[in-house]
Amino acid sequence: KDTLYITHEEAEAKPGKNVRIIHGPFAGITGKLHRARGGYYFIKTLAGVGVMMRISRWYCEVTE
């Protein structure tokens, strides 16, 4: 329901910070954090497709 699929180009075109998820079942995965639609979304690109999941920003740490 809160998962959106976007292309690799769409994921790279948006400004965002590189982050690592530090809590929950996705802990350790790195990607980008974006703010959209009044919430925070974690973006991970796999095989040329971006997956955007709603996440609390407190579950992420900046890796830049």
Residue map of PLM features:
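Ferredoxin-like alpha/beta domains used as RNA- or RNAP-binding modules
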Residues: 1-64
